[in-house]
């Protein structure tokens, strides 16, 4: 399915969010592993497994044609030889949609965990789990602070 090679997990993550912004389902699915054991959970959604369910869910999300911008912040990355886990905050804005006061709509931030597996064809996403961020966004991490999730 995928002819693209992502030399690092960060390259795969960048390609995932770029495809989301462009509304390019094929480019987004090229980031995912071809394994049937992939998992995706959208905010408030059920657990989806396998290529068919994951692809169908993203096709529905991208079908309305809204152009979104995603700013990733608060990234914590943990990497090993064969696996990488990225915890991020996804900050969305929707272009062209206007609220009642004429300002861009800005949905609440989303916290997401993306898991990447190193394969013979480069790094591939195997898990994307996203949930609404509770309350206020946490402040940016300072240099030298611990990189511990819990």
Regions found by a protein language model. Name each.
Residues 1-33, 37-150:
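A beta-strand edge to alpha-helix "cap/lid" segment located at domain peripheries
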């Amino acid at each position: 399915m995928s002819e693209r090679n992502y030399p690092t997990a960060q390259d795969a993550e960048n390609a995932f969010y770029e495809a989301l912004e462009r509304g390019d389902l094929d480019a987004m699915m090229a980031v995912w592993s071809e394994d049937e054991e992939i998992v995706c959970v959208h905010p408030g959604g059920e657990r989806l497994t396998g290529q068919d369910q994951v692809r169908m869910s993203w096709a529905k999300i991208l079908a309305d044609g809204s152009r979104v911008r995603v700013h990733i912040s608060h990234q914590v990355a943990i990497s090993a030889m064969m696996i990488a886990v990225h915890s991020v905050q996804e900050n969305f804005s929707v272009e062209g949609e206007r609220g009642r006061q004429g300002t861009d709509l800005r949905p609440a931030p989303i916290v997401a965990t993306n898991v990447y597996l190193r394969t013979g064809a480069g790094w591939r996403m195997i898990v994307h789990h996203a949930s609404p961020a509770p309350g206020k966004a946490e402040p940016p991490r300072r240099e030298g602070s611990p990189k511990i999730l819990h």
